[in-house]
Amino acid sequence: MLRLKNDRFIRALLRQPVDRTPVWIMRQAGRYLPEYRQLREKVPNFMAFCKTPELACEATLQPLRRFPLDAAIIFSDILTIPDAMGVDLHIAPTVGPVIRNPVRSAQDVNRLQMPPVEEALSYLFDAIRLTVKALDHRVPLIGFAGSPWTLACYMTEGQSSKTFLTARAMLYQQPDVFHTLLQKLTTLTIAYLNAQIKAGADVVMLFDTWGGLLTPSLYRQFSLDYLSQIAAEVVRQKNGRKIPLIFFTKNGGQWLESIANSGCDAVGLDWTTDIGQARRRVGDRVALQGNLDPAILLSNPESISTAAVDILKSYGQGSGHVFNLGHGIDPSTPIENVAALVETVQNFSIKNEEPINSYYR
């Protein structure tokens, strides 16, 4: 197998020497790009778009044509697994995901399908294979999934929410039923990520977007324990190469040490956590990813550069940092501000003194 021409991102995740801090952007393929909006016009239905491998591949590649990013992330959605399980999923243009048959009882959980993922989600794996071929080993490709807790939030609530009160109440009212749902989601997520790796993903990431809504005790029981199970069962080596695993729990800074001990290689931080303090807290256990506030990208290039440099300085010297936002980029972000961010990170490189012997050579 040919080595990656740019393995900076993977090296940083594995805390190996790098020449500069790698950078990519959560939701880097999306509505802030005019070419993406034009592409979406071909298939207005979002899930139908995701299920068209050629379009998903093109959307994945678009940001790399504009910006010298150090990784690509496959264009998809975290709700592909619930969709494959038989929930009646609809993506409303102004509302977001709506599930018309929410899962709120043991009977509802028992009715969920457990399909072979390589068949039910073949479109995603086809998109990965197309993208790997198109990338031609230029940069690594990230595969991803939603955390079981985050997927369960949507499935039980029936739609997006700032509080997911229905989901949280169900933890107290029907904990055994909720655990059964989470275990089903965990089983499928493991198979899903492994199939993405088989198709060609170089890195996999779990988005625990709503983990920060939980109490410390409930976070461990209903989110982190399942993330740890995934970490233990996802393929971590392929053809002699390590496959790094990233966990991102939004508003999860208070549990940073626990997340670092869960079996992942890197922890994503949102913008509410100081990255320098986070580095001191986790030591050399994991790499860190983040953590610029996406809102600053709505300001001006000078403010963006200052904030980015502050984060780079706060992390300090040495490898183990992947620069990213603290959450997904806002659709209204000006293109020139993204360019300013990427340029700043590339130009402000705190180099290692160690010689760089590529992991892939």
Curated annotation (Swiss-Prot):
Any Pfam family: URO-D
Subcellular location: Cytoplasm
Catalytic activity: uroporphyrinogen III + 4 H(+) = coproporphyrinogen III + 4 CO2
Principal place of residence: cytoplasm
Residues annotated for substrate binding in this entry: R27, Q28, A29, G30, R31, D77, Y154, T209, H327
Superkingdom per UniProt: Bacteria
Pathway: Porphyrin-containing compound metabolism; protoporphyrin-IX biosynthesis; coproporphyrinogen-III from 5-aminolevulinate: step 4/4
E.C. numbers: 4.1.1.37
Subunit structure, as described in the record: Homodimer.
Its job: Catalyzes the decarboxylation of four acetate groups of uroporphyrinogen-III to yield coproporphyrinogen-III.
NCBIfam families, sorted: hemE (TIGR01464)
Protein name: Uroporphyrinogen decarboxylase
Gene designation: hemE
